[in-house]
Design a protein with these regions (language model features):
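Long, C-terminal catalytic modules of enzymes
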Residues: 102-105, 109, 149, 237, ...
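Short, conserved active-site loop motifs that form the nucleotide-linked donor/cofactor pocket
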Residues: 152, 184-186, 238
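Active-site-proximal region of nucleotide-activated glycan assembly enzymes
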Residues: 16-93, 250-258
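Short N-terminal targeting/anchoring amphipathic segment
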Residues: 1-7
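Flexible loop/turn segments at secondary-structure boundaries
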Residues: 7-12, 33-36, 121-125, 161-166, ...
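Conserved catalytic-core segment of nucleotide-activated headgroup transferases in glycan assembly
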Residues: 79-176
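A donor-sugar binding/catalytic signature common to diverse glycosyltransferases
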Residues: 10-12, 29, 192-239
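Donor nucleotide-activated moiety binding/catalytic core segment of transferases
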Residues: 129-130, 166-215
C-alpha cells in the first residue's frame, strides 16, 4: 500500500488499517523542493525519521562545498526568498536588523527567549508529545512561567503559515494563558511584518515544539530547548527535557547565564552538517 502523508484524516486511517493488517506501507509527502518527495517504509513520513541516514552520514567529513550550499539556502530563507528548486517559503518580510526589531518590540537588555510555534493541527505536531498533552498546553505553561520571571523576556513568534489555515490560532492560546500579558512577554502574530531571523539574532535562547526554526537557531549558536518529538532532537545540539520538571530546570539554568550556554563550535558545525543531510539528502 502507498499512502500520502499517513498521519492526517483518512490518510492516517488508511495507514493504520494497513499496518494493523500486516500489509507493508510506503508513505510519502511532497518536500520543500520541486520534483522531490520524502519517503518512508512502514512509518509515517511526517515523523521525518532521519536516524538511519544521519547515522550513516554523520562521520563522513562535511565539506566546504556542502556548507556553502546550506549557507546559500539559509541566506535565501533569511531574506524571505526561494532558492533553486526549494520553492516553499513561509514568510516574505525582508530583514530590517535585529536592533531595529528589538526597538520596535520594546525589548531591553534582559535575556530574551524566542518561542517559535508550529501551525496547530499540522502533520508535524500530531502525536509529538513528550511531556505536554499538546503544543498548546506547552505554550500556555511556558507563558505562565515567564509571567513570573520579570528578570527575563519572552518573544513568541506565531508561525506565519497560520494565515493559510482556518483553525485556532496560537495568538488565542497565548492571550488565554494569563489575564493580561506582562510587559516582559511580546507576541508577534502571523501577519506581523517581522522577520523571524531578526528575532533569532536578538534571542539568547530558543524554545520550540517541532518547527525547523529550532534547527536554524542551533545553526546560529543558540541553546535550543525542544519540547516535542522532532527529527533533529537528540543529535547533540539541542536540550531535550523529558518532563515539565526537567523543562523548568533547563529554562532556569539557561536563563541564568545564557551567553555561557551558547553552542560551541563543534555543536554548531554538527547542526550545519545535519542541516545539509536533511535539506539536500533526505528527500528523493
Amino acid at each position: 500500500v502507498v499512502v500520502q502523508n499517513g498521519t492526517i484524516q483518512k490518510l492516517g486511517v488508511n495507514y493504520r488499517v494497513a499496518m494493523n493488517l500486516g500489509i507493508p506501507v510506503s508513505t510519502y509527502e511532497f518536500s520543500d523542493q520541486k520534483d522531490r518527495i520524502w519517503l518512508a517504509q512502514n512509518s509515517e513520513i511526517m515523523r521525518q525519521d532521519t536516524n538511519a541516514i544521519w547515522e550513516a552520514r554523520k562521520d563522513i567529513p562535511f565539506t566546504d562545498d556542502q556548507r556553502e550550499k546550506v549557507e546559500a539556502l539559509y541566506q535565501a530563507k533569511v531574506q524571505g526568498n526561494t532558492w533553486k528548486n526549494f520553492v516553499r517559503k513561509w514568510q516574505s518580510t525582508p530583514r530590517e536588523g535585529g536592533g531595529d526589531v528589538a526597538n520596535r518590540l520594546g525589548l531591553d537588555d534582559r535575556p530574551v527567549a524566542l518561542l517559535a510555534t508550529n501551525v496547530l493541527g499540522d502533520s508535524l505536531t500530531l502525536g509529538r508529545q513528550v511531556f505536554s498533552e499538546t503544543m498548546a498546553e506547552w505554550i500556555e505553561k511556558t507563558v505562565q512561567f515567564f509571567a513570573q520571571r520579570s528578570d527575563v523576556q519572552l518573544v513568541i513568534r506565531v508561525h506565519p503559515g497560520e494565515v493559510l489555515t482556518h483553525g485556532p490560532s496560537m495568538v488565542d492560546v497565548v492571550n488565554k494563558s494569563v489575564a493580561n500579558l506582562p510587559e516582559n512577554i511580546h507576541l508577534v502574530g502571523p501577519r506581523d511584518q517581522v522577520n523571524t531571523y531578526d528575532l533569532i539574532d536578538i534571542a539568547d535562547i530558543g524554545l520550540v515544539y517541532t518547527t525547523t526554526t529550532g534547527l536554524e537557531m542551533a545553526m546560529s549558536g543558540l541553546p535550543v530547548v525542544v519540547a516535542g518529538i522532532t527529527h533533529y532532537k537528540g543529535n547533540g545540539f539541542t536540550h531535550d527535557p523529558q518532563s515539565y520538571e526537567d523543562y523548568y530546570k533547563v529554562l532556569n539554568r539557561l536563563l541564568q547565564d545564557p551567553k555561557n550556554h551558547r553552542l560551541n563550535k563543534r555543536q554548531i558545525d554538527q547542526a550545519w552538517h545535519y542541516a545539509y543531510i536533511f535539506f539536500f539528502e533526505y528527500a528523493v
